[in-house]
UniProtKB/Swiss-Prot annotation:
Location of the region described as Disordered in the Swiss-Prot/TrEMBL record: 1-28, 135-156
Listed GO CC annotations: nucleolus; preribosome, large subunit precursor
UniProt name for this protein: Nucleolar protein 16
Main location: nucleus
Sequence ranges of Basic residues compositional bias: 1-23
Organism lineage: Eukaryota, Fungi, Dikarya, Ascomycota, Saccharomycotina
Length: 231
């Protein structure tokens, strides 16, 4: 026997918002810019896409928390292995040598070799490394990490460069607005009566019918003087 609530839900015109329907919201087509459309990742959100492309989704200051980058276990292991390989390369030691050696002085500090029983796979012995890593080596590792981050940022920089070139190529030339004959006569009448005294000019009820401010009148008179070569 179905409950009353379930029967009402079945008759309702509002369908349940399932994950299958929700994911369709991300499947959008970018029509505004071909470069952004080409580099858009539909599996990411708008904010994540903008950050990956080196752009900002909002021009204002950040209010609230910032989404932290969560690394997967595979990424952490790969990063740790790459760091270890670089350290071993600087110490002239290979990973294969560490996997075979029982000398703690040939294993870096923070690493260990686990020796297991080949039949039962039980841990028989754990050899902890005692090989110290020099400060210069740590600096080299940090430099290598910075170089990796720079390489990752080059993709975003190339997109920004493409966008700048596209904007410069498709920028519209702004046409300067010219004053009409009637507007020129009006500016001339104001200038002949008040000169450069824009504060008195704005209180003239007959000439300044629309009560334009002193700053607006100054811009218009300056433009009229420039068009008529008046200093």
């Amino acid at each position: 026997m179905v409950s009353v609530r379930k029967r009402k839900m079945a008759r309702s015109s509002v369908k349940k918002n399932t994950r299958r329907r929700k994911d369709k919201q991300r499947d959008i087509n970018i029509h505004s810019n071909p470069i952004i459309a080409k580099n858009w990742d539909k599996s990411l959100t708008l904010k994540q896409n903008y950050k990956r492309l080196g752009l900002r989704s909002k021009l204002g200051n950040i209010a609230g928390g910032v989404e932290q980058k969560v690394e997967t276990l595979t990424e952490i292991r790969n990063k740790r292995r790459a760091k270890l390989e670089l350290l071993l390369l600087l110490q002239s030691v290979s990973i294969e040598e560490i996997e075979e050696t029982e000398d703690p002085s040939r294993i870096p500090i923070g690493e260990a070799r686990i020796i297991r029983d080949p039949e039962t796979n039980e841990v028989l012995r754990v050899i902890y490394g005692t090989m110290k890593v020099d400060g210069d080596d740590n600096d080299n590792v940090s430099d290598a990490a910075e170089e990796t981050e720079e390489r990752e940022g080059q993709g975003a920089n190339s997109v920004i460069k493409e966008l700048e070139e596209y904007a410069a190529k498709h920028a519209k030339v702004r046409k300067e607005r010219h004053m009409s004959d009637r507007e020129s006569e009006w500016a001339k009448a104001l200038y002949e009566k008040y000169g450069d005294d824009y504060e008195r000019m704005k209180w003239d009820k007959k000439l300044n019918v629309y009560q334009q401010s002193a700053g607006d009148l100054k811009r218009r008179i300056t433009k009229w003087k420039k068009a008529n070569n008046i200093q």
